[in-house]
């Protein structure tokens, strides 16, 4: 193409409230594969990723760590960028919503929507989840808590996170104004939401029941972009975070040349849990701004474990670094894109991961390369013979297989069916391995009159590997180069455009001794290793508190009787466990973070660790605390109270739990 066609692809921007696991990395790797594919096809690609850094959750997290929100997000953003470097993510820009240019553009967008009447000032009352950064109506709650009179006093969001009743002044976006126009757009652009099932979900669950106007500002926290004309309000996540896809290109700035060049996005890739925000809120916002909508929003499935979603409390979190360090980057990228049909949920198991590395990479691909390099060295002095077709009875079948694979591969990649595209590559790998057995070059080498056939087998195998390596380039960032190197080829000349079987360069010498690119693994050993790493995932990510290694002795009273006046001084309260984890260097201590109805969370250390091997299982429970106990220093930390436990005759301790419906801070008489 004389002037390159543009291709703009985006990941969602990640919320940096914790360490990213392979489920988070899945989206980014898939986007990276698509970006690399399009570059290899000659497109002018712009690949955007980044982090969403504002909100109440970040503000609270920073306060708990005794740092400013900006200090906290600076550290987390650096960690995300470090991970993307580890995963060799070829993004063109990394946006942070704390970037000055983004904040200025968001203020401009908000003001415009107010001026044209799409945003108005009102008052909001609803159930809010800090973890989800989302409001819910009572009917949307997965679980509802009621008092004795039947009044709703709390509950849980569909995600399982606790909600709290929030009433505050807020600016609202007139979603309902654009509902009919959005439905019409869906009908006229059936490719807009992929897979198709996601579109039906949006229509039936959200649009047809009636779109409610959306709260787009908050006053109950300050860590956000302030409104220029009403600074007590900060812009809420919908306009702040979603706008990044255009502000990153310069929309709202003096230089919007990138926006003019790349917008609308070709693909916006998101997890299925945020499809609603990207296919309802986002397109309506763009309609209000008179901007074209992205061409496609693809909502992929989740990467699950056998026992459901990844969770530190379950000890089943897999972090990409631990797999890359032991098995290499390409092993992880290959597995994530091959094992899971993109768009559907997939299940990660250590057994499946290790088995695929063995069978697909070590056995199929690795052996094909090793055998080919060894035979070319042995039978042709390392020089790849010139290409000749139809010399053996099996040549045509192999070249036809390659041609079919190339066509089906491109078709699958354009649809983002990554697992299908990779499966097509392995069709050629398998056929080439079978070709070796069919032609038996070790037999041909014994007869001089079979020399032409032997050389034909060698070039057909080398050419098959060249095709395989070219097609693998979007998926694996290191392995194709290793294959090219062993084949004696220049990676810079191995383009994907107009690739055909039979174009292997002349006068090429392979490496004198091939190196295995994927060693075979001992399955049982590696499964045990991964499981151990998963079980350590909680302690490995304790980032909140640096514990003093000095031992602490807990003192308990032995008195049987006290005066009533003494007891009357004790203030017992209901508190909710917000976080709970073991104290490093102390086998007996657990560190609790509790909401006891105070302005800030309180910290209590308790010597019950041996009775709760999975501390995270206590999160969300309502416990009873001594709230007015004089703070004491333990392990270099302040313990602000005591958690009540019951002791069995055998000496086993169990936390005393309060009724779930009791509000945090309720007194106990």
From Swiss-Prot:
Is required not only for elongation of protein synthesis but also for the initiation of all mRNA translation through initiator tRNA(fMet) aminoacylation. GO terms for cellular component: cytoplasm. It comes from the Bacteria. PROSITE patterns: AA_TRNA_LIGASE_I, TRBD. Belongs to the class-I aminoacyl-tRNA synthetase family. MetG type 2B subfamily. Keywords: Aminoacyl-tRNA synthetase, ATP-binding, Cytoplasm, Ligase, Metal-binding, Nucleotide-binding, Protein biosynthesis, RNA-binding, tRNA-binding, Zinc. Zn(2+) binds at residue 161. It catalyses: tRNA(Met) + L-methionine + ATP = L-methionyl-tRNA(Met) + AMP + diphosphate. Transmembrane segments: none annotated. Residues 566-669 form the tRNA-binding domain. This is Methionine--tRNA ligase. PANTHER family: METHIONINE--TRNA LIGASE, MITOCHONDRIAL, METHIONYL-TRNA SYNTHETASE. GO terms for biological process: methionyl-tRNA aminoacylation. Its EC number is 6.1.1.10. A motif ('HIGH' region) lies at residues 14-24. Homodimer. InterPro entries: aa-tRNA-synth_I_CS, Anticodon_Met, Met-tRNA-synth_bsu_C, Met-tRNA_synth, Met-tRNA_synth_2, Methionyl/Leucyl_tRNA_Synth, MetRS_core, NA-bd_OB-fold. One of its GO terms (molecular function) is metal ion binding. It is found in: Cytoplasm. ATP binds at residue 312. CDD domains: Anticodon_Ia_Met, MetRS_core, tRNA_bind_EcMetRS_like.
